């Protein structure tokens, strides 16, 4: 059962060099130490958090969802699915590595070498593509830390695999170019996610032979289920977030270490704020570290996928592969990928049009797009990924004015694709695949001062007609003084009636995909 921590008796100030720490304790919770600052690790305290302006303005972040699971190039969740008897990943592992009772995920980790990884060159590409923040994988469900981890000394990127501080090198490359820097953590799900590694085949020559996750010599990677119910490994549901207190404390210490070493501007968690007191303490620590760095101002962002976590202060909502159904009152974020989260060979990627349409649609609803370009184990983007990145670069060079530092207008758009976002089991995430393709009849709006940017989601035949910008439309925009098209140097022929704004298209398109009409109000 989750318990909400009360303020009463929670805080006592202690001194420790070089940091001042808040020590907070409960009878049922180990002592959790966090940076001294404006926040305690309680929901009541975190209500006063406000999302910083940089996140409101940034609109586009790029992400390297990258680690040892990228090395086989088989896509998502390889570290778990290779232990699912009969699955495609299990069969692939048998063919290329051997049986998981002998050769398991521990033997995949050394094949993650990052031998072609050039973080400086990649960051140049990301900056040109228009990213204002960059997010590095910190640790995935596979329990492998991508930094020089104090609390996971054997299974981290400095001690094994590439033998480099991946997070630190990404951080340096990003901040050198003026980007905000984020890290993602998926660790809270790891304890029961790895249950499959503790099983065995049910049939065949290896029936009943335990997989290598049962070997206590590797419990620091696969976890120890000692003290758990006898059938835990068989019954555990992936990402059920079932874990003993010892694991929750391990989680707290590791992510706190990540924050302390790399001071991210953004910390993303793959789910809700985990483990109540432990997770809330991490959020508070993250914000307090930021306050120390910025003269008392909290410039940090924490992403949770649980709407209730973000209902009043606390953090910024993130929707995985999804979108909200209206203009959200606070800045939020979609995280998605052009393919699989982990690199998969020969997969079909999102087209540049889909990426551009998503960006304009999300920004019109007060959101940011965090887009993953998955790296293979070598660390080099493939040619098809580079083509998508190049197309995004060209589009943002023309249309970035209507994206960055804008705010939503009175409505996010108009056109045939204005139906509410379909929910998945009552949740707004994971709905991107069920959304209709946007057409030239669809329009998305952003605004900045007395300017309204109308993104027409394709090249219309002859004329763009925008009903919401009619002088007497329901939105009451007022009189339009001038209309321009971003990327087009000539004057446009246009007219505003009571019912619409009509704009004649010039002979040539200024860019591919969506075009931006810039309407200046009187």
Which ranges hold each PLM region?
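Mature catalytic domains of secreted/periplasmic carbohydrate-active enzymes
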Residues: 28-522
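A general, composition-driven signal for non-globular sequence regions
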Residues: 1-2, 17-20, 50-53, 59
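N-terminal export signals
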Residues: 2-3, 7-28
């Amino acid at each position: 059962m989750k318990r909400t921590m009360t303020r009463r008796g929670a805080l006592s100030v202690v001194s420790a060099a070089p940091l001042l720490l808040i020590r907070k304790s409960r009878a049922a919770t180990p002592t959790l130490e966090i940076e001294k600052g404006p926040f305690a690790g309680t929901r009541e305290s975190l209500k006063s958090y406000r999302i910083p302006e940089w996140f409101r303005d940034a609109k586009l972040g790029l992400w390297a969802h990258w680690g040892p699971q990228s090395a086989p190039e088989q896509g998502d969740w390889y570290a778990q699915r290779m232990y699912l008897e009969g699955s495609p990943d299990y069969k692939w592992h048998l063919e290329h590595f051997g049986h998981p009772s002998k050769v398991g995920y521990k033997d995949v980790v050394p094949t993650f070498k990052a031998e072609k990884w050039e973080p400086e060159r990649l960051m140049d590409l990301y900056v040109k593509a228009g990213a204002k923040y960059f997010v590095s994988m910190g640790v995935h469900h596979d329990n492998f830390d991508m930094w020089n981890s104090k609390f996971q000394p054997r299974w981290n990127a400095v001690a094994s695999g590439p033998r480099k501080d991946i997070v630190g090198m990404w951080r340096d490359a990003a901040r050198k170019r003026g980007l905000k820097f984020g890290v993602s953590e998926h660790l809270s799900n790891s304890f029961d996610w790895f249950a499959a590694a503790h099983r065995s085949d049910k049939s065949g020559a290896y029936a009943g032979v335990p997989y290598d996750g049962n070997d206590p010599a590797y419990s620091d990677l696969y976890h120890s289920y000692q003290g758990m119910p006898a059938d835990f490994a068989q019954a555990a549901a992936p990402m059920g977030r079932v874990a003993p207190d010892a694991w929750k404390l391990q989680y707290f210490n590791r992510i706190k270490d990540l924050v302390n070493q790399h001071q991210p501007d953004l910390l993303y968690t793959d789910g809700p704020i985990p483990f109540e007191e432990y997770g809330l303490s991490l959020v508070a620590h993250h914000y307090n570290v930021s306050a120390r760095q910025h003269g008392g101002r909290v410039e940090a962002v924490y992403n949770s996928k649980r709407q209730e976590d973000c209902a009043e202060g606390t953090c910024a909502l993130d929707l995985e592969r999804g979108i909200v159904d209206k203009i959200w009152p606070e800045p939020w974020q979609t995280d998605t990928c052009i393919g699989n989260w982990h690199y998969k060979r020969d997969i079909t990627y999102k087209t540049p049009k889909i990426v551009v349409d998503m960006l304009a649609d999300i920004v019109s609803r007060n959101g940011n797009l965090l887009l993953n370009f998955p790296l293979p184990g070598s660390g080099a983007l493939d040619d098809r990924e580079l083509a998508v990145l190049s197309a995004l670069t060209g589009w943002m060079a023309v249309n970035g004015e209507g994206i960055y530092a804008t705010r939503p207008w009175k409505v996010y758009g108009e056109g045939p694709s204005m139906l509410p976002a379909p929910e998945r089991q009552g949740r707004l995430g994971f709905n991107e695949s069920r959304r209709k393709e946007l057409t030239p009849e669809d329009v998305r709006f952003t605004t900045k001062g007395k300017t309204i940017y109308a993104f027409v989601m394709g090249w219309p035949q002859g004329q763009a007609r925008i009903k919401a910008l009619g002088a007497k439309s329901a939105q009451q925009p007022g009189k339009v003084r001038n209309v321009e098209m971003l990327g087009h140097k000539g004057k446009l022929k246009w007219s505003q009636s009571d019912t619409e704004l009509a704009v004649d298209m010039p002979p040539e398109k200024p860019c591919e995909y969506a075009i931006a009409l810039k309407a200046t109000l009187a």
